[in-house]
Amino acid sequence: MRRTAAVAAGAALLFSAGVAAPAVAVPTGTPVQIVAHTSFDSEVADFESSLEGCESGTVVNGDNAQAHFTPWGGVFSGDKEFTCDGGLSGFTLRLMARFGEGGSTGTWTVVGGWGDLEGLKGSGSLVGIPVSDVAIDDIFTGSVR
């Protein structure tokens, strides 16, 4: 009797494993590149992007943006608010970056979107390349969905 119960329990376990729900894949993102032409002389910068429907516009620092200077350069933390041409949609990236004479590196995450970009999600990395003494091209690469 015990052997019959054990076989039945084993068969039930195998059967339940065979009918388990299939794994659901995490949605894949769409590659994105955003280039912000940042000038230290202006609060507003122009940008271009590969984001459909938001190929260009302007970007400003959010209210929580802070730069902390150190002997080796500094750290930027806070939001970058991107407004697409026309002003009807845009998105906000939260950026953590280190910077110095040679440029900057960091990571970013989408924290919000509005208009046609409401619900936007994504993340990636940043490389900043100095183009003059007062300007840098911030290149954001990653994926969005």
Where are these regions (language model features)?
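C-terminal region of N-terminal signal peptides and the immediate post-cleavage residues
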Residues: T4-V7, F15-Q33
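Beta-strand-enriched cores of mature, soluble protein domains
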Residues: V24-R145
